[in-house]
């Protein structure tokens, strides 16, 4: 096994350098998907293990390919992964001009597809990769150019946050068949790169039905080696080096954000005695009828109907207040009575607002932008059982600057 870290997951210099440093004994490499990422990866890997892989993915123009071939001259173990058929022509042409023998990989579009939020990049209609027909044409072009021995890696990607290991094993088995066929056609295959997809259990549910969780752990994920071994043994193909690009699994927990709860805003409560005759003085006939319905319901029916009439009465009173026919003191008493009704039937569910020294848009924009769920825990009073429901509200003027999903 030889993993690579996809730089796109977090391009922070210190994160990438630490991964190269601590992964050196494991020959752990980097994956780049653009020219800036490639330059960053080349710079960092010059200080890493010389056997570590530099996987070059993404859209490639002549400049990108020239940079990747330069990595070869720097003694980096680069692999140029073809994601579009026309890229093979540029690789052949530029490598001959620079007198560099490249290491080439192909990204295959598998039939295996998952239906989750991140599954759109997989399957025959996926965004990236070559179809079976295109792979065969690439093999033919490399053969005609005397460079078929340069083809050494097969790459595929089922999608991020793969929901089950059964789906992954199915895709790996399909890829192993393609790998074995490429060996049969004369390519000197060495590596199977099955991309990313190792999921993170963000919400702790261990469920395969949510985009925020997976029902497996690292050990179960590693069992996919069985699918590769089964195919290779059956076809008498030498076992490949297995490579993965698990960016989310490596860096999703790399940092911790600690913030202070400045103050607490508790739900408003009505402590004054409720004067029913005072309320009734200003009510319209319809509002009075709603009140008597509420009173009759309280004596003879269940909680559900009781709350229905209470809410209907409250809305009628609010409309009167908007029209100017009900005073603010009477409206406050109506709120107090409805609050008492909720408590009486056990439906009261007060939510506290904790004002936190934080800007959601600055520190955790993914929470707002893509509804990413972040594990949040207190750092004090851990010996006490939580007893209140709450919302975390930041100190900015943005109405979306709050955390209400946990």
Swiss-Prot record:
GO terms for biological process: arginine catabolic process; putrescine biosynthetic process; spermidine biosynthetic process. One of its GO terms (molecular function) is arginine decarboxylase activity. It comes from the Eukaryota. Substrate binds at residues 192-202. Pfam families: Orn_Arg_deC_N. It is an enzyme of class 4 (lyase). InterPro entries: Ala_racemase/Decarboxylase_C (IPR009006), Arg_decrbxlase (IPR002985), De-COase2_N (IPR022644), De-COase2_pyr-phos_BS (IPR022653), Orn/DAP/Arg_de-COase (IPR000183), PLP-binding_barrel (IPR029066). Its cofactor is pyridoxal 5'-phosphate; Mg(2+). Keywords: Decarboxylase, Lyase, Magnesium, Putrescine biosynthesis, Pyridoxal phosphate, Spermidine biosynthesis. Its EC number is 4.1.1.19. The modification N6-(pyridoxal phosphate)lysine is found at residue 8. Pathway: Amine and polyamine biosynthesis; agmatine biosynthesis; agmatine from L-arginine: step 1/1. It catalyses: L-arginine + H(+) = agmatine + CO2. Belongs to the Orn/Lys/Arg decarboxylase class-II family. SpeA subfamily. NCBIfam families: PRK05354.1 (NF003763). This is Arginine decarboxylase.
């Amino acid at each position: 096994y030889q993993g690579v870290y996809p730089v796109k997951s977090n391009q922070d210099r210190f994160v990438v350098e630490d991964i190269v440093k601590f992964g050196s004994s494991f020959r752990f490499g980097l994956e780049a998907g653009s020219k800036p990422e490639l330059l960053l990866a080349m710079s960092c890997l010059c200080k890493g293990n010389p056997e570590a892989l530099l996987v070059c993915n993404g859209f490639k123009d002549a400049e990108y390919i020239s940079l990747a071939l330069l990595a070869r001259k720097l003694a980096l173990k680069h692999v140029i992964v073809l994601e579009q058929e026309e890229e093979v022509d540029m690789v052949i042409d530029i490598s001959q001009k620079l007198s560099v023998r490249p290491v080439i990989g192909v990204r295959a579009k598998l039939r295996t597809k998952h239906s989750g939020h991140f599954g759109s990049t997989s399957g025959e209609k996926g965004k990236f990769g070559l179809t079976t027909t295109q792979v065969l044409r690439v093999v033919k072009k490399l053969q005609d150019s005397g460079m078929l021995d340069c083809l050494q890696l097969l790459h595929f990607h089922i999608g991020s946050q793969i929901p089950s290991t059964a789906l992954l094993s199915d895709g790996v088995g399909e890829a192993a068949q393609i790998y074995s066929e490429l060996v049969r056609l004369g390519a000197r295959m060495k590596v199977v790169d099955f991309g990313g997809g190792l999921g993170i259990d963000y919400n702790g549910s261990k469920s395969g039905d949510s985009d925020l969780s997976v029902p497996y752990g690292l050990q179960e994920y590693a069992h996919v080696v069985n699918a590769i071994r089964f195919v290779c043994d059956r076809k008498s193909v030498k076992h490949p080096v297995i490579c993965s690009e698990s960016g989310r699994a490596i860096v999703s927990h790399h940092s911790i954000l600690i913030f202070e709860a400045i103050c607490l805003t508790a739900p408003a409560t009505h402590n004054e005695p409720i004067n029913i005759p005072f309320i009734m003085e200003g009510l319209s006939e319809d509002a009075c009828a709603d009140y008597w319905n509420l009173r009759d319901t309280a004596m003879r029916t269940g909680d559900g109907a009781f709350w229905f009439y209470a809410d209907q009465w409250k809305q009628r009173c609010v409309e009167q207040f908007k029209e100017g026919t009900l005073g603010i003191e009477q409206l406050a008493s109506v709120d107090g009575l409805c609050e008492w009704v909720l408590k009486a039937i056990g439906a009261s569910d007060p939510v506290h607002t904790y004002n936190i020294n934080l800007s959601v848009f600055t520190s955790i924009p993914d929470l707002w932008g893509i509804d990413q769920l972040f594990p949040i825990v207190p750092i004090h009073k851990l010996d006490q059982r939580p007893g209140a429901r709450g919302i975390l509200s930041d100190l900015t003027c943005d109405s979306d600057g709050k955390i209400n999903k946990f």
